[in-house]
Amino acid sequence: MRALAEKGFNLDEALVHHSAMTDEHGYRSMQRFLKRPNPPTAVLCSSTVTALGAVRAINQAGLVIGTDISLIAHDDVLPMLKPENFSVPLTTTRSSLRAAGARIAKRLIGGILDQGDYPEQELWRAELIVRASTGPAPDRQRNSGKTV
């Protein structure tokens, strides 16, 4: 959110939803977003599983992914749900789950053994894999402001 503010954007808190990363939660959240007077033109899901539900809601609303609304998800590396196999191949971010797991284990063990001073949170780089689910924002007169 700080990065958005630094670029002059305001974040509409009603467009942020935290939930379990399931397809049902993705579906319900997307339904709620799409019912807003000014629905979003792009959505970022925390996982491809959540995006699966978001896709269902978008399709039921009669919108075209990548044209009417862009969709991005995290977790490019889930073997059981490949983003390129979605009806519209899904743009994703990718970061190493193995490296993250190793880092978490190191921090937990270090904390238990009182070895090392670890920050409460860390930022990791993620690779953006662009596919067909993203495109230019639709030309909507109502979305001419800088609120995201």
Could you say what each language-model-derived stretch is?
Residues 1-148:
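Bacterial carbohydrate/catabolite-sensing allosteric modules
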